[in-house]
């Protein structure tokens, strides 16, 4: 409005200055009308003066005056036309100035709005970009432990898979080894028997070695899963079982190897069936004697972690089967003496059960570890979610402040600016458009 005050003052002064000019023009027009009336009267008088020579000179004088008046009137008329033309030019200049000022104001208002809108969008984009960069940095920092946890979890899974494949390969190799070993045993049995018959100490060492081989073939490690020749003192003297197998719950299994070979070999070499039966009976009695001797050692009293029985390892299926043929109650007799008879087949089953329990213990440990990692991962994801929600609230507040600015600009600035159109100011159909309102809730695309 301040820019229009000089224009209004100029217009008002022009109107004040034009009032005398209009009055003067009106007076000249009145005089001209009177002059025309007098000319008409003079013409009438001239008609009458034709008859009167004396009046001719007066008529001529009036004519001269009329000519002068008409010339003056023509001059006044030309001056009036020039003044009117100048006045119209001034009016046109005023209108052009008014149009230029209106266009300049509209352009200035549009540029101001566009500049303010652009500056706000630029600042908003800068803030959004900064918030996005900070959010990405924070998110990357927060997700780094998650990545590390996932890498550790992936490494654990790969290790478990490799362990499974290794165990499967070990089992396959073990079966192949057992098959080859059985063939080798058949070929070397006679040589071994002859060597063992002549050296009792060698028989004991052979039985202990067979026991160690069976345990190790099942995946148990010496000094970790089992120990050999562990000595304890008792009332009956120094006791030394051949092996102690450790179980994950803290218990132990006591295993002692017993080899009864002489009577069995005599029966195998006997040609007469009666003698063969006698030797087999002697072999069965020797097995029973080993059971009695092992029962009397009371290993369950010396090892508090051991159950109330001891395992008697016989390093050969045929040794036990030959004794059972002569005494069918041998299993029950040994059980009553708290002795469990075990051949390589039975002991393999026991050892594999123990190894499986150890593996289950490892799996349970890994499962607990995975559970802890999962809990840690969940807590960190919850923190990430909280930060994401805080970032969303910040963006929502920025959009709300922008909408408040647009609403204030629309209701307090543009409303006043649009009133110029009500004053019939030429704006050449230029209209100030409304600033857009941003949506607070982002539109999400539907995903099938």
From Swiss-Prot:
It comes from the Bacteria. The keyword Protein biosynthesis does not apply. One of its GO terms (biological process) is DNA recombination. Keywords: Coiled coil, DNA recombination. It holds the Pfam family RmuC. InterPro entries: DNA_recombination_RmuC. Residues 43-167 form a coiled coil. Involved in DNA recombination. Belongs to the RmuC family. This is DNA recombination protein RmuC homolog. It comes from Zymomonas mobilis subsp. mobilis (strain ATCC 31821 / ZM4 / CP4). The lineage of its organism: Bacteria, Pseudomonadati, Pseudomonadota, Alphaproteobacteria, Sphingomonadales. The gene is rmuC.
């Amino acid at each position: 409005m301040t820019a229009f005050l000089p224009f209004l003052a100029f217009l008002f002064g022009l109107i004040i200055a034009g009032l005398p000019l209009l009055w003067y023009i009106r007076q000249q027009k009145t005089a001209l009308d009177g002059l025309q009336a007098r000319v008409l009267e003079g013409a009438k008088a001239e008609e009458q003066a034709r008859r009167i020579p004396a009046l001719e000179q007066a008529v001529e004088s009036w004519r001269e005056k009329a000519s002068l008046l008409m010339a003056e009137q023509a001059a006044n008329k030309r001056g009036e036309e020039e003044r009117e033309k100048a006045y119209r030019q001034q009016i046109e200049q005023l209108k052009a100035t008014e149009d230029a000022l209106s266009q300049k104001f509209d352009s200035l208002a549009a540029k101001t709005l566009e500049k303010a809108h652009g500056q706000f969008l630029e600042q908003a984009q800068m803030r959004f970009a900064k918030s996005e960069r900070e959010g990405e940095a924070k998110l990357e920092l927060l997700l780094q432990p998650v990545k590390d946890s996932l890498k550790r979890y992936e490494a654990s899974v790969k290790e478990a898979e490799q362990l499974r494949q290794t165990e499967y390969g070990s089992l396959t190799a073990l079966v192949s080894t057992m098959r080859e070993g059985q063939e080798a045993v058949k070929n070397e049995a006679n040589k071994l028997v002859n060597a063992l018959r002549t050296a009792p100490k060698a028989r004991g060492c052979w039985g202990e070695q067979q026991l160690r081989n069976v345990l190790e073939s099942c995946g148990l490690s010496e000094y970790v899963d089992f120990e050999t020749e562990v000595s304890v003192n008792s009332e009956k003297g120094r006791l030394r079982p051949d092996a102690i197998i450790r179980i994950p719950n803290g218990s132990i299994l006591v295993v002692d190897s017993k080899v009864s070979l002489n009577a069995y070999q005599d029966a195998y070499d006997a040609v007469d069936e009666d003698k063969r039966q006698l030797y087999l009976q002697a072999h069965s009695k020797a097995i029973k004697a080993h059971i009695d001797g092992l029962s009397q050692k009371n290993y369950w009293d010396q090892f508090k972690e051991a159950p109330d029985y001891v395992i008697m390892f016989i390093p050969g299926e045929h040794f036990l089967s030959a004794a059972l043929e002569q005494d069918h109650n041998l299993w029950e007799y040994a059980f009553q003496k708290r002795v469990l008879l075990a051949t390589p087949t039975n002991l393999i089953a026991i050892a594999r059960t123990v190894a499986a329990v150890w593996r289950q213990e490892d799996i349970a440990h890994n499962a607990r570890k995975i559970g802890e990692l999962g809990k840690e991962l969940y807590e960190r994801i919850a923190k990430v979610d909280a930060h994401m929600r805080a970032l969303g609230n910040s963006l929502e507040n920025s959009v709300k402040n922008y909408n408040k600015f647009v609403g204030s600009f629309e209701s307090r600035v543009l409303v006043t600016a649009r009133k110029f159109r009500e004053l019939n100011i030429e704006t050449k159909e230029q209209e100030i458009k409304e600033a857009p309102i941003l949506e607070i809730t982002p539109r999400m695309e539907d995903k099938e």
